[in-house]
Amino acid sequence: MIEQLSVRNVALIQSLALEFGAQFTALSGETGAGKSMILGALSFLCGQKVGPDLIRKDENEAWVSAVFRCDHAPRAVHTWLAERSIEPEHHRVLLRRVMRRTGRGTAWIQNVPVSRADLEFFTSFFIDLHGQHEHQSLFRVAEHRRFLDTYGGLQQEVDAFTACYAALAERRAQLQRLASCEHNRQERLEFLSFALEELEHAALDVHEERALEGEEQKLCQHEKLCDVMQRVDAAIRGVDLQEGALLSSLKKALGALESACGIDGSLEPARARLESAYYEIEDVAHVLRTYTDGIQFCPDRLQHVQERLALIYRLKKKYGGTVAQVLEYRARAQQEMQDLSQAVGDKEALEQDVQRLMAQVLHAGRALSLKRHAVAEAFRTRVEGVLHRLGMASTRFHVQICTRDEQCAKQRTGPYGFDDVEFLISANAGEPARPLAKIASGGELSRVMLALKTVLSSVDEVGTLIFDEIDVGIGGETARAVAEHLQALSEHKQVVCITHLAMIAAHADAHVCVKKESSGEHTNTSAAHVVGERRVQEVARMLAGDTHSATSLAHAQELLRAGARQRRGECGD
């Protein structure tokens, strides 16, 4: 349950602090005073997504905090806290959330930073907040299934069916993609097969191209190369070492230098170097002569080299900019072809998966339908009983479950089973049951929603029920019935209710009055518990808009006494 709520700089609220008792608290105030702002602040603390518009004008941040008592909370709450090393203090935890003008926010539980989603999950174990116009959700037939499943405790079965259904849908989608791509797959396989055959036959080597280009150049310029090499040989060796050739001149110079060394020994190093140069050049001349003698022109070889290079250039243009890239393409093509070739096997496996999952879906769907039919009657009886206590004695409540047969379910089903669930109402004796949207007034819808919340609260562990204007469209004896019902409900749950009806406020254990006051350019919403004479005056205002007339005050006092007697379990008008 929630024990304390503190709000600062939220909308019109500058600063507000409230304490809540364990039973029934009513919030009242003039229209527009800001009652719903208080619940809006609580919704913000409970993880609702909001923007910086929440922040009060001229302020930089808004914050809300609350103390929750958790000694009677579900075991899942304590496990969740322990996993995050959050320790309650005296069975209580402090929740805080801040929203800054920049749009960024921060949240804590017991000074441990948490996410917005953490707040939303954690508080879902404590609070069920019925906001304004939530009764309109009764017009959404899809919500009816959720109500029934919640009452029957079927969420685990629904989740299991949903998971199986999702797996089936995914396998079917994969099969459909395979079927739609079958033609393209065959074309792609044919192309890859041709490309790989072409590349395998080519047997490219990453170093081959450069070698072939060098060989082609030599073969194409054979005559020029031979002429150049002959001239080089003539310059070095001459013809039979004729006069003027390089080697002949060096040999003469070496002989002269040897004579000079006999006169001056310091010339010996120079002679040695010249001698070394002579033999080095002689060796080069031999190498070049051997090279020249080996030059041969082969037209067939030139044709082969040019054809091979033409093939390499064509494959590079077709499959990649370089031979290395062509080889990479070949590797990718081999893998793709392998994957595409496996698609036939994948298709067979997927078809088997679809059959297996369909059998599971049918089994789970049938079991879920049986359980829904089993709990529907008990749910109908309990809701109808609450409606009778809320002044709808002639009303008959029906739970209509339309279950698709197995053949239809194979073709068309949804993630929540084979059943379409809809609540129907017969408001008067003898009238046929009709959808809520066609028969229920605003007051009837509010009471139907209250009945549903009451019945559902008996099967969940949420300790606090919060209602915003659950009394819309009712008055008189109906208001008395709703007030007494809320009071009875508060014996087992903490109930907080925003109300415009004096009858409901008078039956509450505690009464909070919300006011809006203006000072200069600023407007502020405040809230405080009213007791004694102040509570009498507030109930009188709710009755007749008059806080001073003796008649209104007397009527208010009588309502409060009746509410007190009801809380004590005493009989009387």
Curated annotation (Swiss-Prot):
DNA repair as UniProt keyword: yes
Gene encoding the protein: recN
Name used for this protein in its record: DNA repair protein RecN
Keyword Flavoprotein found: no
Residues holding ATP: G29, E30, T31, G32, A33, G34, K35, S36
Molecular function via GO: ATP binding
Similarity remark: Belongs to the RecN family.
CDD domains tied to this protein: ABC_RecN
The species this protein was found in: Treponema pallidum (strain Nichols)
Function: May be involved in recombinational repair of damaged DNA.
Record GO biological process: DNA recombination; DNA repair; SOS response
